Amino acid sequence: MTDILVLDLETTVERIAGRIDNSPYNPHNKIVSAHFGWLGWDDVDDYQYAVYHHIEQSQSDSTKSLREALRTAKILVCHNAKFDVSWLLEAGFDVPEKIYCTLIGEYLLAKAQRKELSLKGSAERRGLRNQKKSDLIDHWFQDGVDFFEMPLATMLEYAEADVRTTAELYLAQMDDFDAQENKSLITARDQMNEMLVFLVELERNGCAIDLAALDTVEKEFRAEKVELTARLTEIVEQVMGDTPINLNSGDDMTKVVYSREVIDKAIHKQTWNIGTNDAGKSLMPPRMSSNQFSDAVRATTRVVEKTQAVCCSHCNGFGSIQKFKVKTKIKLGKKYRIQTEEPYKNRTKCKNCGGLGAIYQPTGETAGLRMIPTGPSYAAAGGFKTDKETIQTLIGVATRKRKPVAVEFLTKLSRLSAVSVYLDSFVAGLKRGTRKNGILHANFNQCIAATGRLSSSNPNAQNWPKRGFPVRRAIVSRFDDGLLLEADYSGLEFRTCVELSRDAQGLADILEGKDIHRQTASICLQKDPKDVTKDERQGHKWASFQPLFGGTGAGMEPHIKAYFGKFYEIYRGIEAWHNSLMTGTLKNGIVQTPSGRQYFWPNVVRTRGNRVSHSTQILNYPVQGFSADMVQLACIRALRFFRQASLRSKLILTVHDSIVVDTHPNEVEQVKSILVEAMTRIDEEMVTRFGYKCVVPFDVEISAGKNWLDQEELSLTNAT
């Protein structure tokens, strides 16, 4: 028997607005049972369980055995350990200093390949002797019965299988990490398990939400949505005539934006390779010359004309017809059907106008904005793409071609889409997730993004716009006169790319303090760098990032495209590193970061035009992954320093490259100093952790305010 404890908890499950909520921060949820045992040579020894809250058991089992096991254990092993550790801490248990999550192990060993990482999926994929017994409980959950109410014997059998499967999975992972080709992953694994403890701290602390401020933001967004919809409707009437258009329909937006409609959807999908393959991946667009593309567009779609509505004579504009019941009578042995004056309850849809109440007659004038798709990648099931990225590209095209109506429509359509997301996801998410005590406990995910970056849900703060986003005003301090303090890495992805490539000019620019994002915005906006605003700098970061990942500026305005070419001339070391990455990946399919994280592309090939398949991922993943590991190391250090200082201030969020702290008014300077120390001096700890010495310095910007929106920059003088 070892000092490694394998554990699985079963809990009750509440529902909030129809959504499953098994959070330990829901006051109505409880631990139903704990199942645990000591790791043996090939299984669990001394398996035990304790039932604390079940309908069949009137008296709760003692917590003594679990407390003693947790006190004795050196390592706690769970699958999705963040869930179990959070529950244990909220229930008043102490946990071992070292946590091992088998979900993290499977995630890292997958090396960015899509694999089922659940306990059941992992056990089945590996062919483990022990298997998760989901079939025992699935039908109970489908019927709305959770662990509290389902038969106790069923739950106990299911949970024991979970513990034994987790133990066997752990042992299999230890063998995998021992293999020479996987040894580098051990460093990344250990850091991710430490980061798990930091995320538990964040989630437990939660964010204070000002619901009154959130209501105000919601009203502002709803008013803006009404205004945008009204103006877009006016433009639609201007360019489409009387044709009815749904702004949320991809088919209708193809008509408005591209002035075309699909003739036959089946033929359209076949022509443009729209759909997924057997592996669930999107099919690649067909290769076509420009002439072939133009011919295919004409073959699969037709030009849309403006229409004029004429009242339907069959239904008089109602769109439906009132029919009357018919009775059968017999006279002289013959049956007669006689219409009565009794109407049917529901009116019948008019076949002549399709229920529209009008006939839409073409006027002969081309409708829509007449934007032109430029290649097969524009094709979509409903015609041609009108997604966020495509709309932004089309706005640039319309601007260059001086189409003011198209620019206005596309800009407002993009904004309407954003506002709808803000309302449906962010505002509604905050309202739904905020507990009665005014605290929101977000959920952070380590094993979703292939790169190693964190994602979050309830809410997805990683997708919030960084500056000027009104929803941020609702996130406030829980302390009287407290501040929300945010420390953000300055230009982290550029610095990471320079670090990995060891580009000499990039290093010189960083050491001189050149603001790369400001330089980029000045070129894109064709204005002096000193005249670039903060929002403009933020809004043009994409142009700084794209060359880092092999972007060429194709399809963009000439002066922006020229910037991309100039970038590679200036930073030749980055271009050389890109070439070496792709050459190396063609040889062995692997890219590895200094932190030990690996990415694997088993099917990488050189394509026509001397390009490399998966090139964007090959160039993107190591920058994102190493950046993620640096941020995570900073988070681990911040938690360590907070605990050493016994601060009242709370670590509450990490978003992108920043750490956010709910700061007690008496601890502002102390928190500022700790964050600077934790974030700017990660290079010292990277030497001991990764055996890697950085040449690039990492700087932070710190701001503070009463809420997360209204922030003022703080001076870093004497911050360390």
Located regions from the model:
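Function-dense linear segments that define catalytic or interfacial modules
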Residues: 443-529
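Active-site-proximal helix-loop-helix substrate-binding element of RNase H-like nuclease domains
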Residues: 29, 40-178, 276, 518-525, ...
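Short active-site loop/helix that positions an aromatic residue
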Residues: 82-93, 105-110, 253-262, 490-505, ...
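Polymerase palm active-site segment centered on the conserved acidic dipeptide of motif C
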Residues: 205, 216-251, 563-581, 666-720
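Conserved catalytic core of nucleic-acid polymerases
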Residues: 197-200, 204, 307-327, 335-337, ...
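Conserved "right-hand" nucleotidyltransferase catalytic core of DNA-directed polymerases
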Residues: 1-10, 15, 33, 45, ...
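Conserved catalytic palm subdomain of right-hand nucleotidyl-transferase polymerases, strongest
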Residues: 6-7, 78-79, 100-103, 478-492, ...
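Short acidic, Gly/Ser-rich segments with clustered Asp/Glu that frequently serve as metal-coordination loops
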Residues: 9-17, 489-496
